[in-house]
C-alpha cells in the first residue's frame, strides 16, 4: 500500500493538534481515517467528521485500570463520545471491543475484531544472534524469567519482583530479565535495590529488537493488572517460549500449549515458576490470525470493502 509519516503536535496541545489535522485532512482527499489511540480517537475522528471524510474507524487496543484516578476518569468520560464520530468500530480483542463500544454494539456485530499482527519470522533469531547476548549477560546455566513491556502500573512489575524474591529461595540460579522502560522504571529499580536483588535482576532498558530477548528466557511472566490483549503474551508463544499470565489477559492471547493462566496470588506464581518444566511449544490453529502475512491481507480487504 505504501505509507508516509507526518509529524503533528502532541494531543496535549489540543487546539494546535486539531488545527494541523484539519490542514492535512483538507489538503488530501482521504477516504478513510483509522485511529488507533483508544479513547483519544475522539479527537482525530471529530476532525475527520468535520472535514467530511466518509469512513472513520475507531480502533481500541486497551481497557482501563486503576493506575491513576484522573487518567482513568478521563477515559470513562471520553468513552461516552467514542461512539459519536466513528462510522466503524474495531478492537484488538472482544474485551477491548466491549469496553469501549459497549456490549450491545458488540453483540449486534457492529464491532470488528482485528488481531494485532506479528511478523513470525522475526521471533526465530539465529544462534549467531542469541549467543553473544547470552554470554554478555551471563545467562548460561541460569533459569531466566523474562518480563518484556513498559514499566507502568498495568504491567505489575512490583508483584513480579516479590514473586522473584521468593523464587530465588527455591531456584538459586534464577535470573529476572526486565526489558523495557517507562514512568515507573526508577521506582522499580529502587525496589530491586532495597531487596538486594541487584545481582539477580537485569534491567535491559528500551530496545528496538525485543524479539531477540524472548529466546533468552526459559519463561516469560505477564502478571498484568489489566490488558486489552497483551502482545507480549502473543510474541512469547510465537518465539517458542512458555508464558505465565494473569487472569487479566484475554483468552484470545492463548495460542499454544505453553501458556498458563494463574490468579494474581504470589504463592501460586512462586510454586509454578519453581516447578516449571521446559516443554516444546506448539502453536494452535488460531495463532494464524496473528501472522502479519495473513492479517495484512485481511486489513487491506477490510479497507477495500469499506470504500466500495
What annotation goes with each model-predicted range?
Residues 13-16, 98-105, 109-110, 115-136, ...:
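Acidic anion/phosphate-binding donor-loop and adjacent secondary structure
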Residues 35-41, 60:
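Short His-centered aromatic/hydrophobic patch
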Residues 143, 147-169, 183-190:
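A conserved mid-protein helix/loop that constitutes part of the nucleotide-sugar donor-binding site
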Residues 189-205:
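Nucleotide-activated donor-binding/catalytic signature segment of Leloir-type glycosyltransferases, i.e.
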Residues 206, 225:
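Aromatic "clamp/platform" in nucleotide-sugar-dependent glycosyltransferases that forms part
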Residues 278-308:
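A charged, aromatic-enriched C-terminal amphipathic alpha-helix characteristic of glycosyltransferases
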Amino acid at each position: 500500500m505504501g505509507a508516509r509519516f507526518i509529524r503533528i503536535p502532541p494531543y496535549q496541545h489540543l487546539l494546535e493538534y486539531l488545527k494541523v489535522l484539519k490542514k492535512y485532512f483538507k489538503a488530501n482527499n482521504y477516504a478513510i481515517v483509522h485511529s488507533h489511540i483508544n479513547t483519544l480517537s475522539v479527537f482525530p475522528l471529530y476532525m475527520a467528521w468535520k472535514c467530511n471524510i466518509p469512513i472513520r474507524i475507531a480502533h481500541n487496543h486497551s481497557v482501563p485500570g486503576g493506575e491513576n484516578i484522573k487518567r482513568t476518569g478521563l477515559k470513562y468520560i471520553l468513552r461516552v463520545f467514542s461512539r459519536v464520530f466513528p462510522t466503524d468500530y474495531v478492537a484488538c480483542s472482544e474485551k477491548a471491543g466491549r469496553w469501549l463500544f459497549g456490549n450491545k454494539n458488540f453483540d449486534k456485530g457492529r464491532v470488528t475484531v482485528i488481531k494485532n499482527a506479528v511478523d513470525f519470522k522475526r521471533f526465530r533469531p539465529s544462534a549467531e544472534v542469541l549467543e553473544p547476548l547470552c554470554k554478555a549477560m551471563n545467562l548460561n546455566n541460569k533459569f531466566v524469567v523474562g518480563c518484556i513491556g513498559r514499566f507502568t502500573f498495568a504491567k505489575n512489575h512490583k508483584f513480579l519482583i516479590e514473586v522473584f524474591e521468593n523464587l530465588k529461595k527455591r531456584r538459586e540460579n534464577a535470573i529476572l530479565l526486565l526489558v523495557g522502560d517507562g514512568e515507573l522504571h526508577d521506582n522499580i529499580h529502587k525496589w530491586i535495590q532495597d531487596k538486594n536483588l541487584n545481582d539477580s535482576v537485569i534491567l535491559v532498558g528500551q530496545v528496538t529488537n525485543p524479539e531477540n530477548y524472548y529466546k533468552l528466557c526459559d519463561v516469560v511472566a505477564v502478571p498484568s493488572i489489566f490488558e486489552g490483549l497483551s502482545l507480549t503474551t502473543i510474541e512469547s508463544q510465537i518465539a517458542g517460549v512458555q508464558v505465565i499470565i494473569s487472569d487479566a489477559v484475554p483468552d484470545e492471547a492463548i495460542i499454544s500449549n505453553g501458556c498458563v493462566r494463574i490468579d494474581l496470588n504470589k504463592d501460586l506464581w512462586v510454586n509454578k515458576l519453581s516447578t516449571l518444566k521446559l516443554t516444546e511449544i506448539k502453536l494452535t490453529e488460531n495463532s494464524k490470525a496473528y501472522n502479519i502475512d495473513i492479517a495484512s491481507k485481511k486489513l487491506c480487504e477490510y479497507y477495500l470493502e469499506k470504500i466500495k
